[in-house]
Design a protein with these regions (language model features):
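Primarily auto-inhibitory N-terminal propeptides
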Residues: 31-62
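Functional-site microenvironments in short loops/helix caps that host divalent-cation chemistry
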Residues: 82, 86-87, 159-320
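Bacterial N-terminal signal peptides
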Residues: 10-22
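Sec/Tat signal peptide C-region and signal peptidase I cleavage site
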Residues: 25-28
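Surface-exposed recognition segments
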Residues: 31-35, 94-102, 212, 236-238, ...
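Positively charged n-region of N-terminal signal peptides that target proteins for export
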Residues: 1-4
């Protein structure tokens, strides 16, 4: 077990106490109509919608405060997914079973994978947070508000490697760790007032399958994959701009191929054996990580063969291998340096019914003492940046563009 630091102890005490004002109203983000963002009172005359108590979930766009960068969220109806793949599916791996049933509540899912345009805004916080003048007074991180703070990713150690195949604002952001992806979702939640997070593995597969049971969301004819995915047969030069292939029946692009996408779950080579029989809720089905390594990514990437882009295909992160060229000690909690990390990205999810403070915290923060120690050690040494997503931050982001 690694040494704990005083700042970590203070953080945990604050976390046990409560959220402070910065995050107290995340569930109350409103549209111009006064309803929650993405909710309309009347049934829309056209376009996708999901009927829920009190209104209708509809697609919506958000502009990241301080920028002109937008992202779209698509409503997905609740339902039940049979997680995993049948024994006779071509290309199946042993970790894709046994199949288990999970009930999914209505959610919004990012129309596309998160882009460099979005993620570079978050990366820019490092410079802002390192400015002691801007981070003074009420904006200074202390033991009482540390629970609301976010860490910003350090500058890339090997940008030429990460961006070898491009850094177009519409290409998917890649090489971030799961911890960094989780912190991004906490940051964008604080900046917009809506509760964003990574999907659970069950939510991801439900969104990818879009009420299908075939190998792909369009069926099992692999010859059709070309129209829906960027994979090794058609994308030798890296990930493509998001949304440039056909969407699945839910209207989501790139659920097959382009880049693998982080989920919140830890990986088990036993697949879904722990879920047993019967229908589980989303929360019951989460396999929270029990070690610092091995988290689940889904969907396949541009470097992968067609069978790895199936709706049920899984892959485990491997920190030691994926950070093989990282010279830092401890290794970066925010970045990977080695393939297949250049085909690993993320996608946002938002629940129709906001999660409890206790549960959303698990989606946002480190979930293992080794990651916690690495982060806090770097911050104490001045090799990390910590700050609060306050309203003033939007103006500084604008100045930093």
């Amino acid at each position: 077990m690694r040494i704990r630091f005083a700042l970590t102890i203070a953080c945990n005490l604050a976390l046990a106490a409560a959220f402070s004002i910065v995050f107290s109203n995340l569930s109350n983000a409103e549209s111009p109509t006064g309803l929650a963002l993405g909710i309309e009172k009347s049934k829309p005359a056209s376009g996708p919608f999901v009927a829920i108590e009190g209104g209708f979930m509809v697609p919506y766009s958000v502009t990241i405060p301080g920028t002109t960068i937008t992202f779209e969220m698509i409503p997905i109806p609740g339902g039940t997914v049979k997680l995993g793949t049948p024994d006779d599916e071509a290309g199946r791996s042993d970790d894709e079973g046994p199949q288990a049933s999970v009930k999914i509540d209505p959610i919004w899912v990012g129309k596309t994978e998160l882009t460099w345009g979005e993620y570079k805004t978050y990366m820019g916080l490092y410079k802002i947070f390192k400015d002691s003048k801007k981070m003074s007074g009420p904006r200074k991180v202390s033991s009482t508000n540390r629970v609301d703070a976010i860490t910003a990713p350090t500058p890339l150690y090997m940008p030429t490697h990460t961006f070898e195949f491009g850094e177009d604002p519409q290409q998917p952001a890649v090489t971030m760790t799961q911890y960094a992806a989780k912190q991004y979702t906490k940051w964008i939640s604080g900046m917009t007032g809506a509760q964003y997070r990574l999907p659970t593995e069950a939510e991801w597969e439900y969104a990818a399958r879009a009420n299908t049971t075939s190998a792909y969301s369009f069926g099992s004819d692999v010859s059709q994959l070309e129209g829906y995915a960027h994979f090794d047969s058609n994308s030798p030069d890296g990930a493509a701009a998001v949304g440039s292939k056909k969407p699945n029946p839910f209207g989501l692009h790139d659920m097959h191929g382009n880049v693998w996408e982080w989920t919140v779950d830890g990986y088990s080579e036993k697949g879904f054996a722990s879920l047993g029989d019967g229908v589980k809720t989303m929360q019951e089905a989460i396999q929270w990580p029990t070690k610092a390594d091995s988290r689940v990514v889904r969907g396949g990437g541009w470097q992968d063969s067609a069978d790895r882009c199936r709706s049920g295909a899984r892959m485990s992160s491997q920190d030691e291998d994926w950070k093989g060229e990282d010279p830092n000690s401890p290794l970066s909690p925010w970045w990977y340096t080695t393939d297949p990390a250049r085909s690993v990205g993320m996608r946002l999810v938002r629940s129709a019914t906001p999660l409890s403070k206790e549960l959303i915290t698990k989606f946002w923060e480190y979930d293992h003492e080794d990651i916690e120690s690495d982060v806090e050690f770097r911050i104490q040494e001045g090799r990390g940046a910590l700050g609060l997503p306050t309203p003033e931050l939007a103006e500084e982001i604008k100045e930093n563009q």
